[in-house]
């Protein structure tokens, strides 16, 4: 059994909060560049050029890619042969978020109560997902989820008769209804549960 102090989790989450908000992953950069290469509309080309310039400046200056630095979504894959020591895992993650958003000078926009709108002042609590996996490693992935994407998202429960075409129609209706409101670039995707 491998022992890992939760302080390492805190330190890693702090670092990832800053990195995720200032450095766009390579696969995302390549996708944006590929879109730019095949785009021929002047406005779209201009928007994509601005996005590319923005992430280049963010990389170089270590400043946030976007003013909406989001809610920290933390994904933990914890090896079944790991014993986390020295404190509470949930608090260790939240302390990492607290430090990352403070030390990285990132905007704190999480509210305690969505009706009363009182800001927590430190961007906690994080959204935390855990999965137990084989081995003696801990893998931490952090994704800052901007709130603009939440405001433009939609969900619908389909009857089985809707079929794939019903789902496609809903996606197109949702994108059209959102219009110019979400920040570009807009990525359309779906999520599903893995069957075990």
Q: What is each stretch, according to the model?
A:
Residues 191-196:
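Conserved small/polar residues in nucleotide/adenosyl-binding loops
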């Amino acid at each position: 059994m491998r022992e890992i102090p939760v302080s390492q989790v805190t330190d890693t989450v702090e670092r990832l909060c800053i990195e995720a908000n200032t450095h766009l992953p390579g696969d995302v950069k390549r996708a944006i560049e590929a879109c730019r290469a095949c785009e021929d509309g002047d406005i779209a080309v201009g928007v994509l050029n601005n996005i590319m310039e923005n992430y280049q400046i963010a990389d170089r200056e270590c400043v946030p890619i976007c003013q909406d630095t989001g809610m920290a979504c933390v994904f933990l894959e914890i090896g079944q042969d790991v014993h986390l020591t020295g404190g509470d895992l949930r608090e260790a993650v939240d302390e990492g978020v607290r430090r990352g958003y403070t030390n990285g000078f990132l905007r704190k926009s999480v509210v305690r109560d969505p009706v009363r709108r009182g800001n927590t002042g430190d961007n906690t609590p994080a959204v935390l997902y855990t999965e137990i996996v084989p081995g003696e490693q801990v893998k931490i992935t952090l994704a800052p989820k901007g709130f603009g994407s939440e405001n433009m998202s939609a969900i619908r429960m389909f009857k089985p008769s809707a079929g794939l075409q019903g789902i496609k129609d809903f996606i197109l209706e949702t994108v059209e209804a959102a219009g110019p409101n979400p920040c570009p670039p807009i990525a359309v995707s779906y999520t599903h549960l893995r069957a075990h």
